[in-house]
């Protein structure tokens, strides 16, 4: 009988140890799974935060470009007035009746230059997203009698220019 009691007691202790080991293993596994899920959630939140910051920075850059383009829109009017008065497109800021290129400053604009044929080039600093970036406005005189001077906007520097200026196109160099 004593032997049977020892066998039952040792079996009970063995089962108890096995249950404790199982629950300890299960809790450790669940803790690892929970930690991995929390780490993934934190990583997603960080990626989302970084994406939001990048989008906000891009939007600030585009807004700076938009504001500067609106602020200097009178330069296109001056070029057209010069053309209407003289019959030819101006080849410089002075011929268009505009101040020197470097006097044009804005949120990110550092200069505005009128070149041969009335082409207007806006140069930007790093606040635009591309230090030294440029946007060019080319006059189109093909329908000047019926529609007036039309302007074509293009850039080689701002890939997402259409987000800032809907009518502007990006062409890689």
Regions found by a protein language model. Give the residues of each.
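Hydrophobic single-pass membrane-insertion segments
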Residues: 19-33
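Hydrophobic membrane-insertion alpha-helices, especially the h-region
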Residues: 7-22
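N-terminal positive-inside, membrane-proximal cytosolic segments immediately preceding the first
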Residues: 1-6
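Small-side-chain structural scaffolding
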Residues: 14-17, 63, 78, 139
């Amino acid at each position: 009988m004593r032997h049977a009691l020892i066998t039952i007691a040792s079996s009970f202790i063995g089962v108890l140890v096995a249950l404790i080991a199982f629950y300890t293993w299960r809790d450790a596994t669940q803790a690892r799974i929970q930690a991995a899920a929390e780490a993934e959630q934190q990583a997603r939140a960080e990626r989302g935060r970084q994406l939001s910051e990048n989008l906000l920075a891009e939007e600030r850059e585009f807004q700076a470009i938009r504001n500067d383009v609106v602020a200097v829109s009178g330069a296109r009017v001056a070029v057209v007035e010069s053309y209407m008065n003289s019959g030819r497109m101006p080849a410089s800021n002075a011929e268009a009746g505009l101040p020197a290129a470097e006097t044009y400053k804005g949120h990110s604009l550092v200069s505005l230059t009128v070149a041969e044929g009335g082409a207007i080039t806006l140069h930007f600093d790093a606040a635009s997203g591309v230090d030294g970036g440029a946007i060019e406005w080319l006059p189109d005189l093909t329908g000047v009698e019926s529609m007036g001077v039309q302007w074509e906007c293009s850039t080689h520097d701002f890939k997402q220019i259409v987000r800032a200026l809907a009518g502007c196109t990006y062409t890689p160099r």
